[in-house]
Amino acid sequence: MTVHFPFQNSYSALPDSFFARVAPTPVAAPRLIKLNRPLAVQLGLDPNMLETPEGAEILAGKTVPDGADPIAMAYAGHQFGQFVPQLGDGRAILLGEVIDRDGVRRDIQLKGSGPTPFSRRGDGRAALGPVLREYIVSEAMYALGIPTTRSLAAVVTGEHVIRETALPGAVLTRVAASHIRVGTFQFFAVRRDTDAIRRLADHVIARHYPELLGTERPYHALLAGVVARQAELVARWLLVGFIHGVMNTDNSSISGETIDYGPCAFMDAYNPAQVFSSIDEMGRYAYANQPRIALWNLTRLAECLLPLFGEEQEKAVEQAQDILGAFPETFSKAYQAGLRKKVGLFTERDGDEALIQDLLDAMAKNQADFTLTFRRLGDAAGDPAADDARAEFMDPAAFDEWARRWRERLAAEPQSAAERQTAMNAVNPLFIPRNHRVEAVIQAAVNDDNYALFEELVKVLAKPYEDQPDYAAYADPPLPDQRVLQTFCGT
């Protein structure tokens, strides 16, 4: 019995300059570590078949399923502000596309499946640690309600990859609305290939923004659509304390999904200047810098689209600037609305923004845990005697002074205390992928081939907003000797 993938490929039908055709490199002894069964069903796949040895071979790239048209996508990108005219998929191969049960076209890609023409002296492989990290964090982001690529499966290859040392090799099966990036447009812009830019833009509109088909200025509207999605996405990141870590233009998705989880991390103690990525030495992609960087990336996209805006270059630049000018307001609106919900304010009044900023300033000064402070505020909103939020502050008096003003403001809200607590708990997670927990999972898997911690963490993070008494310890911030100070890309 064969494993069937109902491929309906479109990107591989574009001109050859958009990609390189390349098959995955077979591996020695693939073994399935984790299959995301609900996602498999959503994609129209048979999870029981994927869990067979034959399924593991496909998910590891050892065999290519019928209907696949494997390609490595071409793109360029600004990496930490420096432009690289050719990057491309150096260790990822797009098997093809399927239409899921909601009628949405989804890419199925293998990460770590061997070298491609874009590998730049790399081995095209992935180590087990980064594969598990992306599986954990991408699925946690999905459960948090944040647009993201998904993880269908993690497979160990039976081979080792050489990084600083020999590490177990693995392959991640990644699912995305698409893998088209700002850097994809840059690849053709630097080559002055306007026809390819138009072809790519038309493909993106048909795939991600079909409501723009037939409009008077579709390319202007496309830029506006990407600006809006990115502004709202980054606002959602900030609202859960997420730091992407490597917001290069080749990691900026046109569909508005979070993509590429290399050195990502969630904050423990609130610090607007927080950086975890070992390669972000200047703090370019620090927590509070993320909106500014998103706009910078979108400006690079706008530059690529200018030739499609019309022959009058000066006018085209003005139009692009007007569209980009919507980003700050769109971001601020989404971010402030989210913050109000996090503190239980479901109507908008003068002074709300200042009240919330005072809380954030006090949290930063007191090194209060970002996630738990907001979650405990929900408890305090439901029960005035609850003081768990107060316990997050080194100077409890600082919280008391703020809480007095907050309660006065809550009195003007129409909800009952119980309704408010329920609403706050629906936006303030209790469980996030704490860095020390992710690290413990990786160490157990890499050193002992033990995946019990991995399974348990994935299970807990699937319900981030629910109280899970049996797993309460997963909500705890790290002890001083458990703190993860740096994260690594793993490539």
Curated annotation (Swiss-Prot):
EC number(s) from the headed UniProt entry: 2.7.7.-, 2.7.7.108
Reported cofactor(s): Mg(2+); Mn(2+)
InterPro entries: SelO
Alphabetized Pfam families for the sequence: SelO
Binding site for Mg(2+): N251, D260
Reaction equation(s) it catalyzes: L-seryl-[protein] + ATP = 3-O-(5'-adenylyl)-L-seryl-[protein] + diphosphate; L-threonyl-[protein] + ATP = 3-O-(5'-adenylyl)-L-threonyl-[protein] + diphosphate; L-tyrosyl-[protein] + ATP = O-(5'-adenylyl)-L-tyrosyl-[protein] + diphosphate; L-histidyl-[protein] + UTP = N(tele)-(5'-uridylyl)-L-histidyl-[protein] + diphosphate
Any GO molecular function: ATP binding
Keyword annotations: ATP-binding, Magnesium, Manganese, Metal-binding, Nucleotide-binding, Nucleotidyltransferase, Transferase
Signal sequence bounds: none
Active-site residues, record numbering mapped to chain: D250
Enzyme class: transferase
Function: Nucleotidyltransferase involved in the post-translational modification of proteins. It can catalyze the addition of adenosine monophosphate (AMP) or uridine monophosphate (UMP) to a protein, resulting in modifications known as AMPylation and UMPylation.
PANTHER family: PROTEIN ADENYLYLTRANSFERASE SELO, MITOCHONDRIAL (PTHR32057:SF14)
Matches recorded under HAMAP family: YdiU_SelO
Name of the molecule in the record: Protein nucleotidyltransferase YdiU
Species this protein is from: Bradyrhizobium diazoefficiens (strain JCM 10833 / BCRC 13528 / IAM 13628 / NBRC 14792 / USDA 110)
Record gene name: ydiU
